[in-house]
Amino acid sequence: MRRNQTPEGHSIRPLRVGEQIRHVLAEMLMRGEIHGDTLDNLFVSISEVRMTPDLRIATVFVKSLGGASDDTVIGILSKNASFLQAAIAKKIRLKYVPKLRFLADESFEQGSRIDSLLRSPHVQRDLQENDDQEDDSEGSL
């Protein structure tokens, strides 16, 4: 296994570049450098940036943490994509500046749905029964 590969054999470079792009975009949002009246009053989270293996396309996962819908935020960011790409080109040294695609981050909803399922009475009852069975089997040894 090479130094710059994950155990599955994938290159680490797309992960590293994606994280650098995420930092640049998050910093620009924090400083209010992205044009759009709606973004001035909102908190927007950039949770992840996934790069294609050739580093030419960056999929940016965003979540609006305030009043506007994710679609509104994605629309504003998409309109400013060329401005954002130029900023990335100035701050990160790459052969090609990746094309930015913005998608709503669904992981927050999925996490809360899983959490609510784990807290449901049926699951709690099953977990309690499993704990009781394990205690009984340990006591008989």
Curated annotation (Swiss-Prot):
Region described as Disordered: 120-141
Gene3D superfamilies: 3.30.300.20
Spans traversing the lipid bilayer: none
Domain of life, per lineage: Bacteria
Organism encoding this protein: Zymomonas mobilis subsp. mobilis (strain ATCC 31821 / ZM4 / CP4)
Acidic residues bias (residue ranges): 129-141
PROSITE patterns assigned: RBFA (PS01319)
Protein's name in the database: Ribosome-binding factor A
Function in brief: One of several proteins that assist in the late maturation steps of the functional core of the 30S ribosomal subunit. Associates with free 30S ribosomal subunits (but not with 30S subunits that are part of 70S ribosomes or polysomes). Required for efficient processing of 16S rRNA. May interact with the 5'-terminal helix region of 16S rRNA.
HAMAP family: RbfA (MF_00003)
Record-linked InterPro entries: KH_dom-like_a/b (IPR015946), RbfA (IPR000238), RbfA_dom_sf (IPR023799), Ribosome-bd_factorA_CS (IPR020053)
The keyword Cytoplasm appears for this protein: yes
Keywords: Cytoplasm, Ribosome biogenesis
Covalent S-S links between cysteines: none
